[in-house]
């Protein structure tokens, strides 16, 4: 079955088993790793942690194995000056009965359920807004408690080379290039409390 209930169950299961972690950024001192799909899947499923590009790529693989129609897309966070960071967030859009849902397991906070991508809809404190765009791009602004989180560009990302460039740019980035490069961050979703927590034991 590929319905919203199953999607939510898969999300919650994945989020409670896999830790969002940027620890590799602080541990890898050699050349930045490449985004090789087979290596990423093997590493993520074995180590059970990663950043957005690891986790959401692995989860998209899980979804496809369960028969879901899904694709990867780029999303962008804002700097304090309102401009967008160059390094993008990799996330997932799932199509169920003609409706599009955001299914993000790689943010490390905010998201725990599928969010239907319709203007003005609020799901689990997450609000979707569709800005007035002049270039006919399909854009969704995602907010939490009226605070901007990320802007999604609804265009299937099919190029592994593009993801690889973004992946390597992350590992080359400095503290001023992206907040995630400033300090270690580990979070896992606790279904009992319904929120993200610091893992009791950090995997090595």
From Swiss-Prot:
Keywords: Acyltransferase, Transferase. The active site is at 52 (acyl-thioester intermediate), 89, 104. This is Uncharacterized acetyltransferase L280. Belongs to the arylamine N-acetyltransferase family. Coiled coil: none annotated. It comes from Acanthamoeba polyphaga mimivirus. Its EC number is 2.3.1.-. GO terms for molecular function: acetyltransferase activity.
